[in-house]
């Protein structure tokens, strides 16, 4: 007998920051848990999350998520005052925090959020050590992408 498949999507991705690859040179990838309130979890399950302008701020040996917009649900947040842009603490090990502090203070890196997803029943945030691109870097990347598309087109017609 075949099992019935659920009608829910199997993707664990909640939100993506597609602009990050265009705006920054992404280096090392990290994963962190996010400390959330109950109404935020319900809103995330409903898909009311935006992380396009999101970055991580390190303060007093802790990491905080800034700029993530989690819009409250009307039904889930009737008795609580909800701030969609509040600081959300990231759950990282001490070794990871020390490495991030060193990279951001000494080497001039930024910490940019690239994805938010479910891992089992926990919300995880994927972020990268990143350096900002200048305008000429973006133009070079555009030329490289155009050239690779043109090469593929030529190889397709040649075959």
Curated annotation (Swiss-Prot):
Residues 138-159 are annotated as: Disordered. PROSITE patterns: SSRP (PS01317). One of its GO terms (molecular function) is RNA binding. Keywords: Cytoplasm, RNA-binding. Residues 138-153 have a biased composition (Basic and acidic residues). Disulfide bonds: none annotated. Required for rescue of stalled ribosomes mediated by trans-translation. Binds to transfer-messenger RNA (tmRNA), required for stable association of tmRNA with ribosomes. tmRNA and SmpB together mimic tRNA shape, replacing the anticodon stem-loop with SmpB. tmRNA is encoded by the ssrA gene; the 2 termini fold to resemble tRNA(Ala) and it encodes a 'tag peptide', a short internal open reading frame. During trans-translation Ala-aminoacylated tmRNA acts like a tRNA, entering the A-site of stalled ribosomes, displacing the stalled mRNA. This is SsrA-binding protein. The gene is smpB.
């Amino acid at each position: 007998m075949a099992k019935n498949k659920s009608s829910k999507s199997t993707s664990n991705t909640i939100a993506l920051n597609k602009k990050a690859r265009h705006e920054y040179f992404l280096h090392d990838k990290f994963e962190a848990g996010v400390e959330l309130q109950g109404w935020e979890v319900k809103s995330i399950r409903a898909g009311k999350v935006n992380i396009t302008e999101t970055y991580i701020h390190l303060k007093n040996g802790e990491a905080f998520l800034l700029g993530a917009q989690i819009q409250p649900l009307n039904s889930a947040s009737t008795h609580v005052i909800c701030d969609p842009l509040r600081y959300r603490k990231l759950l990282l090990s001490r070794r990871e925090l020390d490495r991030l502090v060193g990279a951001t203070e000494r080497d001039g890196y930024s910490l940019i959020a690239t994805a938010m997803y479910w891992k089992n029943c926990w919300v995880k945030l994927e972020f990268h050590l990143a350096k900002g691109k200048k305008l000429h870097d973006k133009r070079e990347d555009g030329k490289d992408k155009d050239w690779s598309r043109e090469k593929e087109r030529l190889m397709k017609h040649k075959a």
